[in-house]
């Protein structure tokens, strides 16, 4: 009974959200109008859809060009080669062609939460890519890295140009799915991307490309994670400005 009520509530809320998403997420259009070449910077194959799908789909909806730089092959269980392919498929499912996806495969940047990535090496590789592609905005994790994975956090600490970071929310909000929308709406700082129903489905389809990652707990993640439907981001320079003043 309670479950049914919850599901019904979720559906209603969602319907309302997807209808109002243009109002709710009106700011991306404005703040990102001048951006020419945004880059999504991730640590592992699957970050793009597990955490950033609403952003990716939101940007593509605005006809923004987008490319992806993934800093490891996700080789923790020796599945690097498979996971690289899964990333390409998943990006295609989201609407990013393989020509816009780059994977760094460096033995000193292993997919491993216990290894602190060498900041100089990482910075070198990322900045080279940024220059080559004339990237003017980098979108990546914030200092908490959403899941707390140290590779995610390394990315935050590495880049120095115009950067927008994905806000990590507490664990309670993280698994509220779309019920987190009112909270996100009230408290987001710069940009809010809310997926429509069809975009949510698209994100799930992209996640299905990561077959090697679909262990039982990931299915639970997919069901309840707010990051499958909602992304709130803020500009890093705003952050710095606040700290300076
Ligand atoms: C892929 O990258 C190219 C060159 O930066 C860009 O023109 C194009 O719009 C991008 N495609 C997508 C779907 O973002
Ligand atoms: Zn990751």
Indicate residue ranges for each PLM-predicted region.
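The feature marks non-catalytic terminal segments
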Residues: 1-15, 160-245
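Active-site beta-strand->loop->alpha-helix modules in alpha/beta enzyme cores, enriched
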Residues: 1-160, 215-216, 221-223
């Amino acid at each position: 009974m309670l479950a049914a009520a919850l599901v019904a509530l979720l559906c209603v809320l969602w319907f309302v959200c997807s209808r109002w998403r243009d109002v709710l997420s009106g700011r991306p259009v404005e703040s990102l109008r001048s951006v020419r070449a945004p880059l999504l910077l991730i640590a592992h194959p699957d970050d793009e859809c597990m955490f950033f799908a609403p952003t990716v789909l939101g940007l593509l909806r605005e006809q923004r060009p987008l490319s992806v730089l993934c800093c490891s092959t996700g080789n923790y269980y020796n599945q690097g080669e498979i996971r690289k392919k899964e990333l390409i498929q998943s990006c295609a499912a989201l609407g990013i062609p393989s020509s816009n996806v780059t994977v760094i495969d460096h033995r000193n940047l292993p997919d491993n939460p216990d290894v602190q990535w060498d900041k100089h090496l990482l910075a070198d590789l990322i900045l080279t890519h940024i220059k080559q592609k004339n990237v003017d905005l980098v979108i990546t994790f914030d200092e908490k890295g959403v899941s707390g994975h140290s590779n995610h956090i390394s990315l935050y600490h590495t880049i120095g140009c115009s950067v927008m970071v994905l806000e990590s929310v507490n664990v309670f909000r993280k698994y509220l799915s779309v019920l987190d929308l009112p909270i996100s709406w009230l408290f987001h700082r710069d940009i809010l991307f809310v997926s429509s129903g069809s975009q949510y489905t698209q994100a799930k389809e992209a996640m299905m490309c990561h077959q090697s990652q679909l262990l039982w707990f990931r299915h639970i993640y997919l069901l309840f994670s707010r990051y499958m439907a909602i992304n709130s981001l803020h500009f890093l320079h705003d952050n710095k400005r606040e700290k300076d003043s």
